[in-house]
Amino acid sequence: LSVTRKQCLELGMVLSLSPMGTYLEGTMGCLQLKHGHGGFVIHNTTQLRIHFIQGKDAILIRMPKIFLRLQSATSLDNQNVRNEFAWLEQTFKRRAYGQQSQSSSIILPEGKGSFWIHWITTQDGFCGLPLVSVNDGHVVGIHGLTSNDSEKNFFVPFTDGFEKEYLDNADNLSWDKHWFWEPSKIAWGPLNLVEEQPKEEFKISKLVSDLFGNTVAVQSRKERWVLDAMEGNLVACGQADSALVTKHVVKGKCPYFAQYLSLHDGAXQFFEPLMGAYQPSRLNKDAFKKDFFKYNKPVVLNEVDFNAFEKAVEGVITMMVDFEFAECLFVTDPDEIYGSLNMKAAVGAQYKGKKQDYFSGMDSFDKERLLYLSCERLFNGEKGIWNGSLKAELRPIEKVQANKTRTFTAAPLDTLLGAKVCVDDFNNQFYSFNLKCPWTVGMTKFYGGWDKLMRSLPDGWTYCHADGSQFDSSLTPLLLNAVLSIRCCFMEDWWVGREMLENLYAEIVYTPILAPDGTIFKKFRGNNSGQPSTVVDNTLMVVIAMYYSCCKQGWSEEDIERRLVFFANGDDIILAVKDEDVWLYDTLSASFAELGLNYNFDERTKKREELWFMSHQAMLVDGIYIPKLEPERIVSILEWDRSKELMHRTEAICAAMIEAWGYTELLQEIRKFYLWLLSKDEFKELAASGKAPYIAETALRKLYTDVNTQPSELQRYLEVLDFNHIDGCCESVSLQSGKETVENLDAGKESKKDASDKGNKPQNSQVGQGSKEPTKTGTVSKDVNVGSKGKEVPRLQKITKKMNLPTVGGKIILSLDHLLEYKPSQVDLFNTRATKTQFESWYSAVKVEYDLNDEQMGVIMNGFMVWCIDNGTSPDVNGVWVMMDGEEQVEYPLKPIVENAKPTLRQIMHHFSDAAEAYIEMRNSESPYMPRYGLLRNLRDRELARYAFDFYEVTSKTPNRAREAIAQMKAAALAGVNSRLFGLDGNISTNSENTGRHTARDVNQNMHTLLGMGPPQ
């Protein structure tokens, strides 16, 4: 920064443009200042007190008292707009410095922005030079930008009243320090997103484009439903392909549990009052907008007591140091990074599929390369596109009825890998300090962990519990910057890692989020739920808020340690204070609100059992506190099914058993249901293979209390165990090709029929070879003589060579052995059905043109099949087809489906015949349902509704009555329909030459004579 005599301010402040701010953001080292009074050095730039000038690309730096005060500059007033101005450049050489003056120019306001325009010639390195009035020598602004398209240059002007507003009011300004990023660093826009997309190694599937950059668009409907409703503190910055995912992990009510309740009245009376309290979250557009727009609140300024806040942050750092929180490392080992990834999660907004599929074909070198590139992106401050979606989960019925569903903001892979390098080691050490420091992150609630937590709250004190409302979206940049400062304090000294860490938290606050309507939004506050350190960061911010609240009341660090006990986990917090300090609870809500947090501390009690923390309540069992969920929440595990396999269902029931321990009656009822379930045939095989675990009472007691089981308790299990039981599933089976033959295969065994017929049959008859009705004997011979003879009933061959078979040269051209075994499925041979290859080609083409994955195509195929049931599969259909999303119609173009259907759409849809028939039958089981095809044909018999669609495939199994109805409906549909092979050819000339010769005697132009008749008189 070039500093001139006219540029320096009287109150010991230096004015700087964003290049200076960027320099301060990226360094912990020295700052050198040179001017006419000598040179100055500031060794730690993070200790500088900085004020951001609102609406201007400039900052004020308040210098230490040792910095010499200099002559002040005056501001621009409106009368000087037409005056000419020049600038001064002061060059500092090794031994001398000189002052140079450049050419002059008039200046004009730029318009709506914060810059003014001048036309003085510039070159690189001139940023920061002052513009000086030629008339009076006053500094009126500082040069900042040059235009790439014209000769214009831009400078930041001193506003009217600058001296009064800033210089004379210096003590009342908000002077900030410890800022590791500032507005110029994070003022990215659409251009940054487009230029900073991941490199080809990341194999992205979706590209970011400018929101309003496309002048040509496909005329299919693309509704920007999030953008249209956006308002407040959010900015749209780009667009990319996206869609609202409405597929829920909760498949519906558990059919086994419903059947069990219908068969057992006692169980139904017990469970029904506890059911219905939780339901699957709603995944719709209004729910997304309702939760996502929590980010649009402005950041409130001038409410925080910065002295108390800085003291609070220092107090948290001191507390962690006192508990020997050690230096943390930047983890660059690829095996550690990839080993801790959730491979079942999605890759990111610009990618397709899950991580396990994405990494399946990569070797160790490819993975290490991706990690390096992710770190490089983070180091350069390049932003990844985060994905905003609705969270599919069970929620309280009140939240569901209010259409409140939580949004989830997931980090993309190109940011996630580098982020884990920065935060993983700190997080792991943070987990290990649970209950030592005032947090429970990393604590297990089992093995007496909850008892240890409750006992940490002193006896006789007044307890309180609270959790934050709209916590993630209410977090301010100030709090997240404080978390960054704590992390920087404990991280190893590596300048590359430090730059990555600072840029990561700049991205966390000022995040580009891809909404389901395809719009990319930039937010300016709040944490992201899908970043790799969400819980740790949220917990740290709650701890800072508690220290801040106490510091505002004048408490020292010793007072906090002696008079207050609290534990935080995410946005949850429990506290304990002495009775004489209960007044502190009355001040906490206001102090938290100053930091932007919405908390209520009215829930107070003297009993630990009445505290709620992380959705758990303490219960005293045998002198030990154990954590308990609400009974309704445990029953919801039984009520709702999210399993993909039978084994997953048994695991869910076992989880409910574990959570129910302590609720004696509830646990007993769950065990009864589990016993009934294992008696069903499909679960018997599962139990026989050891995949249906049994959880003993002794195991649950050990799990919760960490008290070893006594031998006398185990003896009770030994008494009922059957040690003679043969492992495995043994059943007596028999072949069904011929009962008598099968029974007689056991030599020496006498059947019941043999015994009854003993006196009526000859005793020494021989059994003929191959006989189906062997003569009974007292003892059946083990071996049969190959030369023996007996009575035999002959069997005719189904196809013999005596038949009139096709021959060539006297030789049968058929393979009779193969023909006897060749029994293909009839429908696979129908030429009215598309071949499997044609069907696969159609499916793949539609999938590509719709740009969907297999999971999304499954939903689309469901919707299209149901649409075709009602609307038919005529090749003349065009326009759009619709699918319902709740009460909303979603339109899809028909063109990709019809054009790619070879041979015809109806032949393609014949593959859906059985599924469509089953769907109609299912709908009819719930309420009367007749497809539109049947309504148009006036089909009155609802029993035939299952055949009332035009792509039904008639097979040998189709009943005669149904075949007749189908034929009649087709005849009715085609009545009066004719088609022309050729239409009118409009390209043929109809002109012809008239070669007829006429004379004056002709009767008229078409007749020469009247053939003897006289002309009219």
Swiss-Prot record:
Reaction(s) catalysed by this chain's protein: Hydrolyzes glutaminyl bonds, and activity is further restricted by preferences for the amino acids in P6 - P1' that vary with the species of potyvirus, e.g. Glu-Xaa-Xaa-Tyr-Xaa-Gln-|-(Ser or Gly) for the enzyme from tobacco etch virus. The natural substrate is the viral polyprotein, but other proteins and oligopeptides containing the appropriate consensus sequence are also cleaved; RNA(n) + a ribonucleoside 5'-triphosphate = RNA(n+1) + diphosphate
Superkingdom as given in the UniProt entry: Viruses
KW Protease (keyword) present: yes
Keyword set, alphabetical order: Capsid protein, Genetically modified food, Hydrolase, Nucleotide-binding, Nucleotidyltransferase, Protease, RNA-directed RNA polymerase, Thiol protease, Transferase, Viral RNA replication, Virion
Pfam family for this entry, one: Poty_coat
Family: Belongs to the potyviridae genome polyprotein family.
Name of the protein this chain belongs to: Genome polyprotein
